[in-house]
Amino acid sequence: MQTGHPADGVYFGLMSGTSMDGVDGIAVRFEAGKPPAVLSEAFVGFADTLRDALFALQQPGDDEIEREALAANALAARYAVCCHELLRTAGLSPDDVRALGVHGQTVRHRPERGYTRQLNNAALLAELTRIDVIADFRSRDVAAGGQGAPLVPAFHATVFGSPDETRVVCNLGGISNITILPAGGGPQGEGHARNDTVRGHDCGPANALIDAWVERHLKQPFDDGGRFAARGKVDETLLAALLDEPYFRQNAPKSTGRDLFNADWLDAKLAGFQHLAPENVQATLTALTAATVADEIARHAGDCRAVYVCGGGARNPVLLDALATALAARGLDAAVATTAALGVPPQQVESLAFAWLAYRFNARAPGNVSTVTGAAGERVLGALYPR
């Protein structure tokens, strides 16, 4: 008697987020009816030259096509290094891996114009790894009228749902987003999300601005432990000015990125606040992230009893404390913890999600949640580049 699913097997997931500091990779075994089994993980950093090129491509400029193509090749090379490290540490050969799901590097996200661009040379990546590559997950959702983001809520529902309580999974990456998992879902090892009840959307800036400010003033890539923010004091007048942004008033479904929330946006908002000490601005940016996330949870998940955080912000205790305070100020009795409390380390969640999306592609099963993205319906996401 045949058991399992034809798509079962080992998958790799690669995720390079809006921090653009490197790529997180994971090797995981998926079997129908069972939770994901992580085999190994790896992180490969980006050289400053690549990071600078990626940041430059966030905004329109001269000779974009040439610069974009060269950056895509450089990205594929770093992604391949990450894959070879996963093979080595998991004791696998390329033939052991069913496929690798790769997000690519978002350089432009404009679903209102019908497109989103995640930079990557998937053909080169397949050539360098000799593994089937599944890429370009967001475009199909956008083609179906959706935002193309966030895409991880279906995975969140698969592994983090609860039969007893409404939960919110909050990703604090460059941009913050939430997934609302109403009570009654429950983890489902076979990977079928309760798409009729799952909701989620992008809230606003998180590490994109926090990191940019600390890098400008301390020449550090991120606010380690939130210590820079902890030295400062929130300026309520500046916070009000930052919150006066039309995106925060938009109804869901909605998504955003560095197209909007970047250093130029911040500098425009800081006009008239040049007297503030840098640490006070940092404290206020941290409060902005907490406030925008708490506002969206209060608006859409008032019965939430637990918020589980993943992404780089999960390593910032000052930000987590600010989020807990902001939730309480809005009358929510919701505990704040990281996804480690549910058995998945925060740094693994997004790379796991893209491995899972590759698994869903091979199963020819939907990967989006139309109630989250606003797409016309559920769609199989991704495009295959054979080994």
Curated annotation (Swiss-Prot):
Gene Ontology biological process: 1,6-anhydro-N-acetyl-beta-muramic acid catabolic process; amino sugar metabolic process; peptidoglycan turnover
GO molecular function: ATP binding; kinase activity; phosphotransferase activity, alcohol group as acceptor
Entry's family note: Belongs to the anhydro-N-acetylmuramic acid kinase family.
Organism for this UniProt entry: Burkholderia pseudomallei (strain K96243)
Annotated ATP binding sites: G17, T18, S19, M20, D21, G22, V23, D24
Known function: Catalyzes the specific phosphorylation of 1,6-anhydro-N-acetylmuramic acid (anhMurNAc) with the simultaneous cleavage of the 1,6-anhydro ring, generating MurNAc-6-P. Is required for the utilization of anhMurNAc either imported from the medium or derived from its own cell wall murein, and thus plays a role in cell wall recycling.
Designated name of the protein: Anhydro-N-acetylmuramic acid kinase
Superkingdom classification of source: Bacteria
EC number: 2.7.1.170
Known pathway: Amino-sugar metabolism; 1,6-anhydro-N-acetylmuramate degradation; Cell wall biogenesis; peptidoglycan recycling
Pfam families linked: AnmK
Reaction equations catalysed: 1,6-anhydro-N-acetyl-beta-muramate + ATP + H2O = N-acetyl-D-muramate 6-phosphate + ADP + H(+)
KW Nucleotide-binding (keyword) present: yes
